[in-house]
Amino acid sequence: MKSKSSLLKSGLLLSLLTLVSRVLGLAREVVKSTLMGTSATADAFTVAFMIPNLFRRLFAENAISVAFIPVFTQHYSMPSSAQVPCSSKTKEFLSAIFTLMSSVTASISLIGILGAPYIVRLFDTDQSLTVSLTRLMFPYLWMISLAAFFQGMLHSIKVFVPSGCTPIFFNVSVIFSMYFLNVSHMNVAIAAAIGVLIGGCAQALFQLIFVYMHGFRFTLQSPLKAMHDEGVRRIIALLLPTTVGIATYLLNDLVCTALATSVEIGVAASVQYSLRIQELLLGIFIVSLSSVVLPDLSFHVMRKDWQSFEDLLITAIKIVMLITIPATFFVLFSSDRIITLVYKNAIFNELSVRMTATIFRWHSVGMLAIALNRVLISAFYAQHNSFAPMIAGTISFVTNIILATLLFIPLGGKGIAFSLSAASMVQTVFLWMFLKRSWQITIPSLYKTSLYYGVKITLFSVIALVPTWASSFFTAYFFPGSHKIISHGVPLCVEALIFSCTGCILLLLSRDEFAYKALRSIRFCR
């Protein structure tokens, strides 16, 4: 059983790799904005990459997080090393999953390639270019689904480093492809699509090495035989309810992207640029935390150790609040500086900055809800309950579609961004409500602890903004340079430092448990 400090240690290790990956992901978007801006080409690539990426979330992330890890952890023996490989029962199970996942994703990729002209008609983009890009990138679905399968095996035995490295390979592949293939006068969107394929292949092959090193074995078998595997039937039973929820999620993204492309040129790309920075902020800790916490929650469920389950869940929720609430306030204060510093260039002009910064502010409002949803959904999945997240996700989808349809004409891109944030909050509310039905957890204590901590961090964030706001007048006076590094980068760093230091002092004065653990760790390192 992992202690709180062990959870933090595992989370920080994966967070370090995720930080590198997210920074490179942001660098990828910066290169994209430099070469494409908010042009029709950028919109075409955004749409074309979104289509296989949505199916990836269904067949890769959904299957692994909802069903594979809980079933694998609780019902199958793990290999001890390459010399002592997994049991025959485990090998049969892994072979069945490998066969079905390969067959399904390869078939969908083929259908997507053939049906691309009909799919892209939903979007108001350059049809010819979007079709070519969609066809080129659909095989990425097959590659990344296998990578997710390998990741699930490694996470089940608490091996997180390889899967933390693979997104780095992906981002580097896309960046290098855009730069070097563009030099040879290839269309930059086509170059980026080739990078996507290279990156997906690298993600799968790199993890496969570690899978075999840790003793996992599997082969292709008859799909009919695979369907009759006991573990596969368990996974299908868990996946069926979420298929509806994920289908609504896919439709949700499709509708919002279609609305964005119909507003004006560049809105779809601006939404993507905004989401990339949001993913950087969330991904550094939150994605890593949810990846680390799921196997441990599943372990506590298997042992019926509900007190440890509740303690771990409360710890995860507090960490989420500690990170996302201050980040939200700082983003609302500094969104213009952030977008200017990251994206502004000759092609990504002042109009693009204003459009993206406004969308970014509305996206940031939903960061806490999105982060909480990741942790709360893991709590349901660990209990083999995929029905409650499905219902909450469906309600969120309906909310998003209604709001986006009503707001995209009068408000444009910011209306679409607000709709996503509001829908995420609605999903959080319903997940809390459904969690109340879990009799094993002391819900009043969980609510009270979470609410108190959230209010405390919100208050501290507001207080920390006061000296940050005051310092902005001095930074504007002392750093008026025309170069964005001087006029925006230096002030942003100064303001972030003041905001962070003020917040840390307030946490230490309030004897916050996480602040004291961090302080003890620093003293120990010295």
Swiss-Prot record:
Which pathway is this protein engaged in?
Cell wall biogenesis; peptidoglycan biosynthesis
Compartments annotated for it: namely: Cell inner membrane
Reading the lineage from the top rank, the first entry is Bacteria
Q: Which organism is it from?
A: Treponema pallidum (strain Nichols)
Q: What is its main location?
A: membrane
Record-level GO cellular component terms: plasma membrane
Its function, per the record, reads:
Involved in peptidoglycan biosynthesis. Transports lipid-linked peptidoglycan precursors from the inner to the outer leaflet of the cytoplasmic membrane.
PANTHER family assigned to the protein according to its UniProt record, in alphabetical order: LIPID II FLIPPASE MURJ (PTHR47019:SF1)
List the keywords (alphabetical): Cell inner membrane, Cell membrane, Cell shape, Cell wall biogenesis/degradation, Membrane, Peptidoglycan synthesis, Transmembrane, Transmembrane helix, Transport
User: Which Pfam families does the annotation name?
Assistant: MurJ (PF03023)
Name it.
Probable lipid II flippase MurJ
The cross-references to InterPro entries, in alphabetical order and at most eight, read: Lipid_II_flippase_MurJ/MviN, MurJ
